[in-house]
Amino acid sequence: MYERIRFTEYLDLDLNDEHWYCHDCGTKLISARESYKKGCLVAERRPHEIHNPVIEGEYSFAPDENWVRILEFYCPGCTRQIETEYLPPGHPITVDIEVDIDSLKARLKKGVIVIKDGKLTKPEAEVLA
């Protein structure tokens, strides 16, 4: 049995059932062999809702919605915002985390790395050396 690994501020990986979880509420999002974003609620925001114009006129220093779209990814359990993405219109959602689960499990089994307090680290003997 493995302890959950804290991958980001709001995202945990459980190697026992190979799923992504919300760190805040523990909601199971999706298989860790897929992008965690597929297990999230997604909100598309218009740039002017988030970035108020700095000056009046055409060149306001606010992003142009013809050039950028903003996607926000939320936990379906507690609605914690997990990630935000700025993409060109029509661009597919990016895959920003791809874990080689089989390799990670093999390294943990061999003792090359260990999970301590939710973090991947080297075994104590190597840390002290």
From Swiss-Prot:
The keyword Cytoplasm applies. Its EC number is 6.4.1.8. Its cofactor is Mg(2+); Mn(2+). It comes from the Bacteria. InterPro entries: Aceto_COase_bsu/gsu, ApcB. One of its GO terms (cellular component) is cytoplasm. Divalent metal cations. Magnesium or manganese are required for activity. Its main location: cytoplasm. It catalyses: acetophenone + hydrogencarbonate + 2 ATP + H2O = 3-oxo-3-phenylpropanoate + 2 ADP + 2 phosphate + 2 H(+). It holds the Pfam family Acetone_carb_G. It is found in: Cytoplasm. Keywords: ATP-binding, Cytoplasm, Ligase, Nucleotide-binding. GO terms for molecular function: ATP binding; ligase activity. Inhibited by zinc ions, carbamoylphosphate and beta,gamma-imido-ATP. Acetophenone carboxylase consists of five subunits; a heterooctameric subcomplex of two alpha (Apc1), two beta (Apc2), two gamma (Apc3) and two delta (Apc4) subunits assembles with the epsilon (Apc5) subunit in an unknown stoichiometry. NCBIfam families: AcphenoCarb_ApcB (NF042974). Catalyzes the carboxylation of acetophenone to form 3-oxo-3-phenylpropanoate (benzoylacetate) in the anaerobic catabolism of ethylbenzene. Also carboxylates propiophenone at the same rate and 4-acetyl-pyridine at lower rates. This is Acetophenone carboxylase beta subunit. It comes from Aromatoleum aromaticum (strain DSM 19018 / LMG 30748 / EbN1) (Azoarcus sp. (strain EbN1)).
